[in-house]
Design a protein with these regions (language model features):
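Flexible, glycine-rich beta-alpha linker
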Residues: 18, 61-78
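Active-site Tyr-X1-5-Lys
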Residues: 36-61
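Substrate-positioning beta->alpha
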Residues: 43, 47, 73-78, 92-114, ...
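Alpha-helical membrane-targeting segments
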Residues: 78-100, 149-191
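Glycine-rich Rossmann NAD(P)(H)-binding loop
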Residues: 91-96, 123-131, 141, 153-154, ...
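Mid/C-terminal beta-alpha module of Rossmann-like enzyme folds, strongest
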Residues: 113-178
Length: 212
C-alpha cells in the first residue's frame, strides 16, 4: 500500500506503446486498440502504465503524446541539421503519416487534466494534424530558409543495417547511439495518427502550436 497518496499523479507515456498498427488503412490509433509495443522504449512505457493502473484508487492520469518537439529536443534537431546541409532522408517508400506535439501544447493538456481533477484516464496528445514525411521536411527547409534540398528515400533494409552498425560501434566505444535498433523500428513505422477527440471533448484541449 502507499502511505502518501498524491492528489493527482500525471504520467507521460508515449504513443509508441501501440507499435505498428493500422498500417493497411491508416486509421487513427484510439483507446479501443490493443497496445503491442515493438521497442524496448514502448515496452517500458506500457509496463509503467500497467503498474499505475494496478494501484487501487491511485489518482493517475496518463498522457500518450506523439512526437514531442521543442527546445533541447535532439532527434528532430539532427534531422534539421541534415536538411540544413541540403540532404533529407526519408525512411522507406511507402506512405508514412506523421503527427507531432509542441511541448507547450503538451503542458496545456497536463494543466487541463489537473484543473479538471481527472483520474484513472488516459489520453492521446497531438496537434490534431497529420503530416507526410515530405511535408515535414519542407516545413523545416522553409524555416531554415534553405533554397534547395536533395530528397532521398532510403530503403528500409539499408536503414536497418546502418542502425545496427551505429549501435554496435557506440557500444564498443562505451557510448549511446541516437541511431539504433529501437530507433529504426520507430522510423520504420508508417502510421502515427491518433485520436485526440476525448481530450478535446472532455477537457477542452485546443492545440495552439501547429507544426507550420
Amino acid at each position: 500500500t502507499l502511505d502518501m497518496v498524491p492528489r493527482q499523479f500525471v504520467y507521460i507515456s508515449s504513443l509508441s506503446i501501440f507499435g505498428p498498427i493500422h498500417e493497411d488503412n491508416y486509421a487513427p490509433i484510439s483507446e479501443r486498440d490493443t497496445a503491442m509495443p515493438n521497442t524496448a522504449y514502448g515496452v517500458s512505457k506500457l509496463k509503467s502504465e500497467h503498474y499505475l493502473q494496478s494501484l487501487n484508487d491511485f489518482p493517475t492520469v496518463i498522457f500518450r503524446p506523439t512526437g514531442v518537439y521543442g527546445p533541447r529536443e535532439r532527434d528532430y534537431f539532427l534531422m534539421a541539421k541534415s536538411i540544413k546541409q541540403h540532404i533529407d532522408f526519408a525512411p522507406g517508400f511507402k506512405r508514412q503519416d506523421l503527427t507531432f506535439i509542441y511541448v507547450r501544447d503538451l503542458v496545456q493538456a497536463v494543466y487541463l487534466a489537473i484543473e479538471h481533477g481527472v483520474r484513472q484516464r488516459a489520453y492521446f496528445v497531438s496537434d490534431g494534424n497529420v503530416y507526410s514525411s515530405r511535408t515535414f521536411s519542407d516545413l523545416i527547409q522553409k524555416e531554415l530558409g534553405n533554397p534547395w534540398v536533395i530528397h532521398i528515400k532510403c530503403p528500409l533494409f539499408i536503414l536497418k543495417v546502418v542502425s545496427l552498425l551505429a549501435e554496435f560501434s557506440a557500444r564498443c566505444l562505451g557510448k549511446v547511439s541516437t541511431l539504433n535498433a529501437d530507433k529504426y523500428k520507430i522510423m520504420k513505422q508508417r502510421n502515427w495518427q491518433c485520436d485526440i477527440s476525448p481530450l478535446v471533448e472532455e477537457l477542452g484541449y485546443r492545440p495552439e502550436y501547429p507544426l507550420d
